[in-house]
A protein has these predicted regions:
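Membrane-proximal juxtamembrane linkers immediately C-terminal to transmembrane helices
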Residues: 1-3, 45-47, 60, 139-144
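Small-residue transmembrane helix packing/gating motifs
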Residues: 77, 118-154, 179
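Peri-transmembrane interface segments
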Residues: 159-208, 218-221
């Protein structure tokens, strides 16, 4: 879960979030910077939504989100001079490690980001960076406005239940859940499996037809002989 705070919270409201984060259903949490960026790109050249997550605890960030190279499975480390971006975002922007690209922040200002790594991630567009990189890119002092939350029970039902619980808090602006993405992946995989089953069945039937035709051909030739 990503739990985003309202910008104008008071101490009592923040304490309410802190108490919930210490609840029995939560395994651990870490404060992060969460922003929604945008970029006009893609095949249709339309506005794409990009999620930014920045942290001042890069060492433990992989406990909440796995960043790794798709081919080598090597961990992607958050460094000061560039960001790690999701694989789909890299493909959409046609960028590689060492390249730079621009995005628009929530106020419409254009920001330039250098690609330090590309992480295996098949759904959504994401940018990950450490606090030093954030300050360099946005020219602002790093501050947190959200929490990444690990739940003890990772089931979809519990994730949705805990997300709804956080949404009831006055200081919470929104909750981002990964259940939708997980369901989408499951649906895609299920559809691909069905397609593969159909293709295998067609291949088997085609092989039977070919063998039948070859057998008839051999029989006909022997009769003529």
């Amino acid at each position: 879960l990503i739990v985003a705070e309202e910008s104008d919270t008071n101490s009592a409201q923040r304490e309410e979030i802190a108490t919930t984060l210490k609840g029995k259903t939560v395994q651990s949490s870490t404060a992060v910077r969460y922003e929604e960026l945008s970029k006009t790109a893609g095949k249709e050249n339309d506005k794409q939504s990009i999620t930014l997550l920045a942290t001042d605890d890069a060492y433990n960030f992989n406990e909440y989100l796995t960043l790794r190279d798709r081919k080598t499975h090597q961990p992607q480390i958050l460094v000061n001079n560039g960001a790690v971006i999701s694989e789909r975002l890299a493909e959409m922007l046609n960028v590689s490690v060492g390249d730079t690209f621009t995005v628009n922040d929530e106020n419409g200002a254009q920001r330039t980001i250098k690609v330090a790594g590309i992480s295996e991630m098949y759904i959504g567009h994401f940018i990950f960076m450490n606090a030093q990189c954030y300050e360099h890119v946005f020219g602002d002092q790093y501050s947190t406005n959200a929490y990444m939350v690990r739940l003890k029970d990772h089931s979809n039902a519990n994730t949705e239940r805990q997300g709804a619980k956080f949404m009831k808090l006055a200081a919470v602006r929104g909750v981002v859940q990964n259940t939708t993405q997980k369901n989408m992946v499951s649906t895609i995989v299920g559809s691909l499996n069905q397609i593969m089953e159909v293709l295998i069945l067609v291949a088997v039937l085609l092989a039977v037809v070919i063998l039948y035709d070859l057998t008839n051909l051999n029989v006909s030739e022997r009769i003529r002989e």
